[in-house]
Curated annotation (Swiss-Prot):
Organism superkingdom: Bacteria
Similarity comment: Belongs to the bacterial ribosomal protein bL17 family.
Annotated GO biological process: translation
Keyword Ribonucleoprotein: yes
Gene Ontology molecular function, alphabetical: structural constituent of ribosome
Species: Rippkaea orientalis (strain PCC 8801 / RF-1)
InterPro entries hit by this protein: Ribosomal_bL17, Ribosomal_bL17_CS, Ribosomal_bL17_sf
Signal peptide from the UniProt entry: none
Classification via SUPFAM superfamilies: Prokaryotic ribosomal protein L17
Subunit structure: Part of the 50S ribosomal subunit. Contacts protein L32.
Name of the protein: Large ribosomal subunit protein bL17
Length: 116
């Protein structure tokens, strides 16, 4: 049984949710930090950590899994190239979520998620 193994649904159908998480993951790795809602930041954190762990593995199978998930091929190659120098001795905890002011239009909790 899958009790308490709930993924954040983000108020979207499964295909839109997967596309949103892929897009946020790609943009976070590209820019180093993004501002989004707190719930989306918490949801994308596990995906980003998974991509960085794949890059630390460095095998061909890991590279192909990352290419299948992220939207930018060049970004995957650059991630695999510089991840050992940046996160070589760190065992997880590659991201930091900082809460910021609420969004003006709908008062949603906003957060900045960044790579450490």
């Amino acid at each position: 049984m899958r009790h308490q193994c709930r993924v954040p649904l983000l108020g979207k159908p499964a295909d839109q949710r997967k596309a949103l998480l892929r897009s946020l993951t790609t943009e976070l790795i590209r820019h180093g930090q993004i501002m989004t809602t707190k719930t989306r930041a918490k949801a994308v954190r596990s995906e980003v950590e998974r991509m960085i762990t794949l890059a630390k593995d460095g095998s061909l199978a890991a590279r192909r899994r990352a290419l299948g998930y992220m939207y930018d091929k060049q970004l995957v190659h650059s991630l695999f190239a510089d991840v050992q120098s940046r996160y070589g001795n760190r065992n997880g905890g590659y991201t930091r979520i900082t809460r910021t002011l609420r969004r003006r239009g709908d008062n949603a909790e906003m957060a900045i998620i960044e790579l450490v």
